[in-house]
Every structure is written in structure tokens, then in C-alpha cells.
Amino acid sequence: MIVKTEEELQALKEIGYICAKVRNTMQAATKPGITTKELDNIAKELFEEYGAISAPIHDENFPGQTCISVNEEVAHGIPSKRVIREGDLVNIDVSALKNGYYADTGISFVVGESDDPMKQKVCDVATMAFENAIAKVKPGTKLSNIGKAVHNTARQNDLKVIKNLTGHGVGLSLHEAPAHVLNYFDPKDKTLLTEGMVLAIEPFISSNASFVTEGKNEWAFETSDKSFVAQIEHTVIVTKDGPILTTKIEEE
């Protein structure tokens, strides 16, 4: 969507705050011994408290309030009886709507200590890639600069990007124009960023694989070689005064 009024801006900030609060609370609770279903129940309670609705359920009929992906799962992991263990690489992806306005956010992190430093490396580089990407976000610049920044960050750290998972427009639905915010440079994409445009920007940084495939069920994505993959995602509003991250809150 394109934000045109103060009311729209405040509505997007409100749902962004809610999604950030849910994401942070779930991350803080992700300790060895908890199940992904128990983590998802935290989201259910908070959505109810704040008067928000899970977007995966509302828009996609997804079997969970949030997507929780562990180790070999890259995205769209279904909350289940799976028990979190020390050293797991976990991704929590939270999207929701309130009063018709949406936000989408995600974070990858290592639970406690891992004996494989690559797990932490993909998380750190995903954060760097996101920061380098939003530095390119201003009205009149090319959308493709985002993907170029993400891909360059990965390459500089001897890592890959996942090419068939992308960011997207967001705001009045979970997925809207632009349909894809790529994590690599596409010279054919001439789309320009405009004032008020709302994007979900989400680098996926991989230890080796460049593509995901369908995993153990109809929802989850995995890599064929069990690469470690990390994602960082925020909902971003393009403005001439710099990007507004609706899903980043002060306590971070």
C-alpha cells in the first residue's frame, strides 16, 4: 500500500508494535525444553490481548498463529510438539492484522550455545544484510538496490542468499504489490520506491544453498542439503526522511 494519511500511518505503527511485541516475547521464551506449539500459544494470548488477528490464519488458513522454523526448516514451520534444544537455529515469523492493517516481521537466532559457529554467522550476516538494505530505502531509488545490497553482504561474508524466498509489499493485505522484493539484483526490475510505500524486507542468508524446496509437509520450506538459513524481517515505510520500521520497538 501507499500511506497517504496520518491515520493510516498510526494504524500501521500500531499493528507493527503488536507484531514486534509478540516476536520479542516469543524469542525471550525460546529456551531448551519448550515446544514450538507452546511458543505459538504466547502469540495467541498476546494477539487476543491486543485485539489483533494472526495473518497466516486469516489469509492462508495456516495451522498456527505464527511460523516457527527450526534447524532444517527455513520458513513456514508449523508449531507442533517439537521440543527446542540447546544450539537450535530458530526462526520466528510473526504477521498479523488489526482494523484491516497488517505488519510482518521475523527473526532468526541460536538458542543458547551451538557447537557450530555457522549458525550464529548466518544470523549475524542476515542482520547486516537487512541494515545494508534499508540504507538504500528512499523515494526515487530502485527497488532492486535492496536485493543488490543483500546479495553483496552475503558474498562479502562467503555466504549465499535464498533466491526463491522474497520480501513483498504489505499493508492492507499480507502480500501485495510489489509482489517480490528480491534478495539479489535483478537488472530488469525498474520499479522505483515511492513516498509512503510499505514493504516487508526480509533477507534470507544461507550457508550454502541458493534455493528452498517443499519440506516434510505442505507448508514448510527446507534446503536439499540442510544448509543453515537465517532471516531478518521488518515492515518498512518509505519516506523522504528515512525508512520507518513499524516492527522495531525501543526495547530492542
Swiss-Prot record:
A divalent metal cation 1 binds at D93, D104, E233. Keywords: Aminopeptidase, Hydrolase, Metal-binding, Protease. It comes from Staphylococcus aureus (strain Mu50 / ATCC 700699). This is Methionine aminopeptidase. Removes the N-terminal methionine from nascent proteins. The N-terminal methionine is often cleaved when the second residue in the primary sequence is small and uncharged (Met-Ala-, Cys, Gly, Pro, Ser, Thr, or Val). Requires deformylation of the N(alpha)-formylated initiator methionine before it can be hydrolyzed. It catalyses: Release of N-terminal amino acids, preferentially methionine, from peptides and arylamides. Binds 2 divalent metal cations per subunit. Has a high-affinity and a low affinity metal-binding site. The true nature of the physiological cofactor is under debate. The enzyme is active with cobalt, zinc, manganese or divalent iron ions. Most likely, methionine aminopeptidases function as mononuclear Fe(2+)-metalloproteases under physiological conditions, and the catalytically relevant metal-binding site has been assigned to the histidine-containing high-affinity site. The gene is map. Substrate binds at H76, H175. InterPro entries: Creatinase/aminopeptidase-like (IPR036005), Pept_M24 (IPR000994), Pept_M24_MAP (IPR001714), Pept_M24A_MAP1 (IPR002467). Monomer. The keyword Protease applies. A divalent metal cation 2 binds at D104, H168, E202, E233. Belongs to the peptidase M24A family. Methionine aminopeptidase type 1 subfamily. Its EC number is 3.4.11.18. GO terms for molecular function: initiator methionyl aminopeptidase activity; metal ion binding; metalloaminopeptidase activity. Its cofactor is Co(2+); Zn(2+); Mn(2+); Fe(2+). CDD domains: MetAP1 (cd01086).
